[in-house]
Amino acid sequence: MEIDREDGRTPNQLRPLACSRNILHRPHGSASWSQGDTKVLAAVYGPKAGTKKNENAEKACFEVIWKPKSGQIGKVEKEYEMILKRTIQSICVLTVNPNTTTSVIIQVVHDDGSLLPCAINAACAALVDAGIPMKHLAVAICCCLAENGYLVLDPNKLEEKKMTAFAYLVFPNTTLSVLPEGSSVAEGEPVEHGIITSITHGVMSVDDYFLCVENGRAATASLSAFFRKNFQQSSSKAG
């Protein structure tokens, strides 16, 4: 039985999406990404010469700096930085600019749920805007398990508080289907059935987890279509 949520959405329905790129002048690339009332800004600086200690100088290095809307960053934000860094390293070509560091700054504007996936989508758009060579794009989504056993996608803040478990899922998206012609893309392995990042919190059964993955992957079609439309519009304006 399909249940309607408090905001009127069906379980698998995403909130309205909005994305703008090249919105800041100082960074090499920038983007804002909104899902409903959740909004994040992402800025990319680099690549700059040199890598930090304990980084592989033979590859491109990425650092992620998370800036909350207010106050200092805590344990959760540090975890977000680590997840974002690993995700970015998975989708970017690390052999093109060896011994360099690219900084990705995430600024939270408003958090109304599904904050980390929103930040990942913003970072991906900003990396494209900066012209960073990428193996493929990433589309991120949050899938939650409610107390009644129903799964819902892209929860808002109120829904998050009522959930017993949730999964942050990041799927690869073929760059050829999204990026305009002439963009920096490297040939990579087939990624149609892959998953880049999977983070779970709370307790859910194996069956529920795989259902999350199935529903999440299905929902990325609309995210990918939105990416494609946004990038093509930006490309035509630039042309």
Curated annotation (Swiss-Prot):
Keyword list, A-Z: Acetylation, Exonuclease, Exosome, Hydrolase, Nuclease, Nucleus, RNA-binding, rRNA processing
Chain positions found as N-acetylmethionine: M1
Subcellular location: Nucleus, Nucleolus
Nuclease among keywords: yes
Protein name: Exosome complex exonuclease RRP46 homolog
Signal peptide per UniProt: none
Entry similarity comment: Belongs to the RNase PH family.
Subunit: Probable component of the RNA exosome complex.
Family annotation (PANTHER family): EXOSOME COMPLEX COMPONENT, EXOSOME COMPLEX COMPONENT RRP46
GO biological process: rRNA processing
Uppermost EC category: hydrolase
Record GO cellular component, one term: exosome (RNase complex)
One MF term in the entry's GO annotations: double-stranded DNA binding
Top-level taxonomic group: Eukaryota
Enzyme Commission number(s): 3.1.13.-
Source organism of the structure: Arabidopsis thaliana
Purpose: Probable component of the exosome 3'->5' exoribonuclease complex, a complex that degrades inherently unstable mRNAs containing AU-rich elements (AREs) within their 3'-untranslated regions.
